Amino acid sequence: MTMTTMPESLNSPVSGKAVFMEFGPPNQQMSPSPMSHGHYSMHCLHSAGHSQPDGAYSSASSFSRPLGYPYVNSVSSHASSPYISSVQSYPGSASLAQSRLEDPGADSEKSTVVEGGEVRFNGKGKKIRKPRTIYSSLQLQALNRRFQQTQYLALPERAELAASLGLTQTQVKIWFQNKRSKFKKLMKQGGAALEGSALANGRALSAGSPPVPPGWNPNSSSGKGSGGNAGSYIPSYTSWYPSAHQEAMQQPQLM
């Protein structure tokens, strides 16, 4: 009984319909419906960003339950869309962007334009050293004469001096600044040298001073010699002033 009932149950048309309804027809499993194909191709031209979800939904709607492989088949079947072909037609865009990122300072290495001839910077921010100004002998003589008159110049004076010497105002200003700094250094060095020489002279005078003359010796025993010597060194000014005795005699007479 069991052997005969099993084939009958398998060969029954109801069971076959259930199996085919569960898995679907083989043609629909292998390729999506033509309606979903047309819908995907038309929608891909308008909105490329939403083409893949619409294709997945349209292909999955023809089945009893959603499967993973119809989405893959729909994408692979429409690989020749205009959007994908346009992306694949520019393979060098990524390399071009990478080369630009690797070399960001190619355009910034150019030096900037000089403004006023005072400050110049290149693309990296480093200051470019300007060429040193070479003054002629006549210009140096005129500048030195003016520096002896005054160490600071007003704007009109500086402009006039620069025009007369054929220089710019910036060159004249820088020359006066350098000259003032050198002059201050020389003054400091000269003051230190004068102080050192004064100290050296004081030490030499204290070490090599002459001895005290014998007339000024307080321990001398001879009064005449000391008096004579004292008279020779200190003149007597008693004749210029009246003595105390004469003043005392004149006071009662005035009374």
From Swiss-Prot:
Locate the region Disordered: 1-38, 95-118, 204-230
User: Does the UniProt entry include the keyword Transcription regulation?
Assistant: yes
Where does the chain cross the membrane?
none
According to its UniProt entry, the protein's GO biological process terms are: cell differentiation; cellular response to BMP stimulus; cellular response to transforming growth factor beta stimulus; cerebral cortex GABAergic interneuron fate commitment; embryonic skeletal system development; hippocampus development; negative regulation of BMP signaling pathway; negative regulation of cellular response to transforming growth factor beta stimulus
- Which Gene3D superfamilies does this one have? Homeodomain-like
Point to the regions of Low complexity compositional bias: 25-36
Q: Name one GO molecular function term.
A: DNA-binding transcription factor activity, RNA polymerase II-specific
- Where does the protein principally reside? nucleus
Q: Which GO terms describe its cellular component?
A: chromatin; cytosol; intracellular membrane-bounded organelle; nucleoplasm; nucleus
Q: Which family does it belong to?
A: Belongs to the distal-less homeobox family.
Give the protein name, as stated in the record: Homeobox protein DLX-1
